[in-house]
């Protein structure tokens, strides 16, 4: 009983802090109510709280995605049913697809009755091996017990809102938010590790490990690269009709694979306020059963109507851009040059010139490299991207590191490309190849310079004669 009371108190505190405007308004109306006395004094704060709750319910989105009936995709339906049986689910499961690489289990009302709905991202159906998809499905279905607990759902929603509020206005007190999030994080992580074990029991440890790694890679790729492709193309009045084929091609690029692994590791290392609901990937992989490596068929689950489902996903992504119908022209991203979907190098040049107050690109790059050694790079990054200043204190420096590494890495790569170097990856501007020598990732080099305070290796590259190395 004491544990339940503690959990309820934690949930209540998290929920209150996650809604500062509602909480403040309730306190104010309660104070006014004390002055009014009697019935009015009780009804006023109750009414204010009711308005806040009603507004929160109204803002709650409906189920995402497109429904996929079992008869439309029998192989997928058979996979879900078999995995459900293996984990002892015992309830019908509806499936919906979404355009992004994500998976979740929900229990909304469908036709007046609570129904389990499994949401699967189209990239998972298209790019994961069948055993890996089985592991993903098993992991999500293993969360059934949490969905039937009103207390857990309340805690989960409050955590999500509180974590999101760290980067929004009105600003939530970050230190207090961190203490509340940290108090409930261990429970969330334990549930995720238990779901990982369930997925390993169903699909095998090798497939479970592969699923964890590939879903994390896909998530980083979509968040950091694919979203940028879409935005840049939209700015040119276009939309990539072969987006998912391009994603598959990018995943086969070893430089993209390395960048995605580094992004995942960096993002997971950055959790000063305990906002992450999932343990780091390395911990999840280490917690899986230790067995000899085993191979499995890399083929994905057969999809009867891949064209129709993919076209729906592309339309949904297009709708999210809020572009007027017919204003974006479809184009084949894989047949286009990098300038069609990657930000132009001159944008990095311009951002550095403005941030450093210099007139020439070479002077701006030199000033930026100086900042890596004198410690002024955080302020420089805030000038490049002012939104960094508005982040909570413990998030500001890592965000500045990310912003400046991206901007300066592209700028240095651009200067080297002007001197006869070549792109080593069509997906990453900062990865370049000298006329003779090894491929270099300038973003990694700039990051290393920030961490060490030594920009000498980057300066040495810029000092090389044209065509050298």
Which residue stretches match the model-derived regions?
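Cytosolic juxtamembrane N-terminal segments of multi-pass membrane proteins
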Residues: 1-9
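Cytosolic-facing loops and C-terminal tails of multi-pass membrane proteins
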Residues: 173, 177, 181, 205-469
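Alpha-helical transmembrane segments
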Residues: 19, 23, 51-59
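Post-HEXXH active-site segment of zinc metalloproteases
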Residues: 146-174
